């Protein structure tokens, strides 16, 4: 059973989603990453009774079992025209200042409104950047056709809030959150950021002309592989 404070947050999240739907007739995208926060916002959308289209943008470097979980959750899978390894072959590894991997594989418009599982508690930077439960964003040039309203229903949720909600609603998570015996071992974080070095090695194997001395993945690509949200 949820504590009173978390129950209030759940109610506020649901009201936010419903308020967006009241002023918008179309379907709202759920930016589904396969991570625990995505499963939470998907559940909230169901409880809110809104019209949504849950979409997983396949980055071509998905953690084992992720695509199976995405399909099991009934989420639509979109595939980019290129792959991460093709981009690396063309441009080398992305960096903090060159985020072409996210731009090509993950950050593009599908619908006019998008629900995202961003939380302030995830990092100090996110706590500084995200101040409101909704935000307007442009993908590409600042033109009306590129405009998206992003909605953050769990922006103020803590790691404990997410954990308790998952337990209370008995949500099934992606395989990466469980050990070999089926016990939930990583309900607070998938911990997949530690695999960025393995991904780098895989990229070097598949694209041998890339130097071993490459400084590695940008945070955005580590996040793609890590499914933190």
What role is predicted for each listed range?
Residues 1-229:
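Nucleotide-activated chemistry modules centered on ATP-dependent adenylation/adenylyltransferase
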